[in-house]
Every structure is written in structure tokens, then in C-alpha cells.
Amino acid sequence: RFEHSLSARADLDEVLAAVGQAFACLEIVDSVYPGYRFRLEDNTADGSSAAQVVVGPALPSIEHLDEVGVVLFHNGAESGSATGRAASGHPAAGVVWLVEQLALQGRRIEAGDIVITGGLTRAVPLAARDVVEAVFDGATRVAVHRPPTPTR
């Protein structure tokens, strides 16, 4: 969550200085691409297949976000792991690009805004009754449970 607004150009340090808190999140994707296989250009044009986001608790610190480890569990089984480096080298790197693109449109990131910086692990299917949980640095957890499909 941004504590300060960001406009025009900002480097990685300026982006991080504007961030008040970083949160454990799960991105829910809804891809039109079979098997979640696509070209980068197509996925970008499709809004990155983003459907929803589950925002969990704040991480203890915004320092060294590129080193924060995450383990993803799908129905209790580990399905992937990564560090913040999986987001273009650093989670704030995409925000540097976003700030520049918004400035071209006369817009900016406002204080209070939350920006999702991209998935760190591969996507997993989320079927009825599934539970997906991410554990950040062995402590901070966020989970989503998809309820059963109603019957008629």
C-alpha cells in the first residue's frame, strides 16, 4: 500500500520510499488460454488474466522484498516456491514501469493505492473445494478456499 503518491519518473529506491506496507497476496487468474500457455504480448493485452486478488496480512518489512521467499500449497501439497526476484528481479521493478506508463496518461499512483506486482510461482488450478495457501518467509500466510459448486 502506497503511503505517498508517485508521479512522472521514479526509480526503484523512490518507489520503495513511497511504499508504506507490502502484503501477502494471492492473485486469482482467469485465463482464456488453454493450459495457461500464451505469449507475453497476448497475456498483456488480456489484462494479464487477472480476475481477483486476495490481500492477506502485511509482511513484517518492505526491506529486501526481492529476497522474501514464498511457498505455495495446493490442497496441502507444496506446488511451488520462489523469491521476490521472480517478479522481474524485484517486486518494485514493475511499479517503476507502471509509474512511467501512468505518467504518459497524466495519471499517477495515489497514496492508499495497492498495486499487485505479479505472481512469483506458477499458477495452479482452483477447482471447487480447493484450498490454495501461500506462506511468505515461513510465517506470513494468505489463503483462498473455493467453495463447492451449488447443485440445483
Q: Model-predicted segments: where are they?
A:
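Charged, cofactor-coupling segments
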Residues: 124-130, 134-152
